[in-house]
Amino acid sequence: MSCPFFIVKKTAISIIFCTFASMKMKRLFLLFLLVVMANVSALAQYDFLTAHRGVIKGGYDFWVYQPEDYYYSQEHTPVVIFLHGASLCGRDINRSRRYGPLDAIVRGREIPALVIVPQNPGGSWNPKKVLDVLDWTRQHYPCDSTRVYVLGMSLGGYGTMDFAGTYPDRVAAALAMCGGSTLRDVQPLGQVPLWIIHGTADRAVNVRESKKVVSALEAEHNDSRLRYDWWQGANHGAPARVFYLKKTYEWLFSHSLADEGRPLNRTISIDRSELKNAYTDMMKNAPKPEVIDGEEDEL
């Protein structure tokens, strides 16, 4: 008696039965197949948001978002790291979902990437701790290590430039808004396609903080991968809607560590006037990701 074969695909399911000796065996096989199909469907049709607490000794707690098609893409999936601002610091990991990519996903923005969101308990972002989160995620979630991106605003803008400048060989592109850098030497940022956005009327973080980075890179003729926008009259919170724009992620995803010379994409632009329509093309009735609590024991 030959064996049964079954092929399960996302768009179609083909079932080829061999001849069974009894109807009972056939019914048992049908039951087994239904269970398998249900499990594959559960993996393939839903996106997940998992909280990981205490998995890195002395490190950050963090969220990992798995996109809907992750079951199929896995090692081809890009990674987006979001570093939040000071207003979201604290021990409650849910604070980091108040704005940014995770909130955009809940509102209906499709982001086809693993999205990593560390929770900063307070103080400046620590680049090594962010790297620890990235490395832990790579060990537990197959992904494309040549397409790792980081973005953030305010304190997260500082964290974005500090992380990209500390590990330029790990970051395919970075987007830093209304921040600056605490690095003594910002020249390694010249290796990374970097987009800086800052409002000229920012009273929380003066635009001079971003301009210092730009001036330092330009002074060394190290700005071929740098672009920047000074939004006239924009306050500190104005750039927040950038996280909700589709083209933000299109710009990030257009870069790869595998690109020869690592050129900067200057084709995709974001005009301040676009922010008012940041939510208009979202999938309003899209199901929200399933939220899962992760491990709580330290490694």
Regions found by a protein language model. Give the residues of each.
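A conserved short beta-strand
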Residues: 170-181
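Histidine-bearing beta->alpha loop at or near hydrolase active sites
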Residues: 199, 228-238
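Active-site-adjacent alpha-helix of alpha/beta-hydrolase-fold enzymes
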Residues: 101, 200-226
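Active-site machinery of serine-nucleophile hydrolases
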Residues: 77-79, 83-131
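A domain-start/cap signature at the N-terminus of enzymes
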Residues: 4, 15, 19, 42-79, ...
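Short beta-strand immediately N-terminal to the catalytic nucleophile in serine-hydrolase-like folds
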Residues: 150-152, 177, 197
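Short beta-strand/loop motif that positions the catalytic acidic residue
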Residues: 190, 195-198, 202
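Gly/Ser-rich "nucleophile elbow"/oxyanion-hole loop immediately N-terminal to the catalytic nucleophile
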Residues: 69-75, 123-154, 168
